[in-house]
Amino acid sequence: FKSNNYFHLILYAFKRILLFFYKMSIVKTFNEHFMEFVNDMLVVFPRNAEIILGKTALIGIKKINPSILIRYWYDYVNTPYKNDIEKGDIEFFINKDYSQDVKDFEDSGYFLKAIDRFREPIRNMQQENKEKALQYVKNLCALSDMYHKEKHGF
């Protein structure tokens, strides 16, 4: 009887370890893909100080808390805009007024400026590059979905 309990305990621990490593691989993939997105934006706009500043901030954030980007992406991009993202209308995001989305944030003005820093270069891209940017967003949403679904186990 006791050996059966130990077996279940070991199996549970093993599943938790597997889940942890699986989630960390999703986080790593998300962060790498996000940086690819930023780097591709820098190819299109190599002298854009806002993108360079954003990249530096993202690198710092990833070092302090690697999973924060994917969690925030899920909560503030994927969840509220999933249907719009799947429709593929990038102009919606470029032209949207985000003031209501960040009104409850401690420093909403800062976040509105950050959104503008990110979307302004996209607004000025050729259509082909806008479509690539949208594909990055779709991929990041898919990864954040995977991370969130695995949050509670297999």
Question: What does each model-found stretch correspond to?
Answer:
Residues F1-K23:
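N-terminal amphipathic/basic-hydrophobic helices that include classical n-h-c signal peptides
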Residues Q135-M146:
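Short, hydrophobic/amphipathic alpha-helical patches that form generic packing surfaces
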Residues M24-E131, D145-F154:
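Terminal low-complexity "docking" segments
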